[in-house]
Regions:
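Catalytic Walker B motif of ABC-type/P-loop ATPase nucleotide-binding domains
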Residues: 161-164
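Conserved ABC ATPase signature
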Residues: 136-140, 144-146
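Helix-to-loop junction immediately C-terminal to a conserved catalytic motif
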Residues: 54
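Short coil-to-helix segment of the ABC ATPase nucleotide-binding domain corresponding to the Q-loop/switch region
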Residues: 97-104
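ABC ATPase NBD coupling module
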Residues: 70-85
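Conserved ABC ATPase "signature" region
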Residues: 114-131
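Conserved ABC transporter NBD signature motif
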Residues: 62-71
Length: 218
């Protein structure tokens, strides 16, 4: 059963000179326990589509259905906080917070119980032990920072993980670690993992690949 659906989703925005039809009639159902890759050339609409799935933008036409209800009918802030976890290429860690504090942050926003214990569990789940907890992000490698970002996503308690070019700043070794971790989260932990990528290694490991061209699935 699908946890997230795109139904006839279009997105049009006004550029400096003209209207741009970035996403054109996308229909797709995403399921828990699966690892998806969205691929295509730059400008094909894949990041725009991910932004719509994340609730950062509303579709011009059509709708996104989460757990049986349109996101247009939901509180967008609560949807983004509780339903979706977003992982970016640039990690987006707070530079003055420790590793542990970065993972704690989304739980403090929703006043979660046992937040410290959960943060430690999620850090262990991504392969970071206690020796990392009090470090600042600047003390970590790119791959380690991305693992902290994934741990923070897990701490949000959402079942959908959206990732925009999560291996874009990583070397081959760290890219493989992150890809394997995201795949494991889908197959062993039951998350719905959706990744926008140019990385063919991610596409090769995905359960399903959505190829976009000029805003369409092809």
């Amino acid at each position: 059963m699908s946890i997230l659906q795109a139904r006839n989703v279009h997105y049009i925005y006004q550029s400096k000179y003209q209207k741009v039809h970035a996403v054109k009639g996308i229909n797709f159902a995403f399921e828990e326990g699966k690892f998806y890759a969205i691929v295509g050339k730059s400008g094909c609409g894949k990041t725009t589509f991910l932004s719509i799935l994340a609730g950062l933008d509303l579709p011009t036409e059509g709708e996104i259905i989460y757990d049986g209800k349109s996101t247009a009918e939901r509180n967008r802030d609560k949807y983004r906080l509780r339903a979706i976890s977003l992982i970016c290429q640039s990690y987006n860690l707070f530079p003055l917070l420790t590793v542990e504090e970065n993972v704690l942050y989304p739980m403090l926003l929703r006043k979660a119980e046992n937040a410290k214990q959960i943060a430690e569990e999620k850090l262990h789940a991504v392969g970071l032990d206690e020796t990392y907890f009090k470090r600042l992000p600047a003390m970590l490698s790119g791959g380690e920072q991305q693992r902290v970002a994934i741990a923070r996503a897990l701490a949000s308690d959402a079942k959908i993980i959206l990732a925009d070019e999560p291996t874009g700043n990583l070397d081959t070794e760290n890219s493989e670690i992150v890809i394997d971790l995201l795949q494991k989260l889908a197959h062993e932990e039951g998350y719905c993992v959706i990744v926008v990528t140019h990385d063919l290694a991610i596409a090769d490991k995905a359960d399903e690949v959505l190829r976009l061209r000029d805003g369409y699935i092809v």
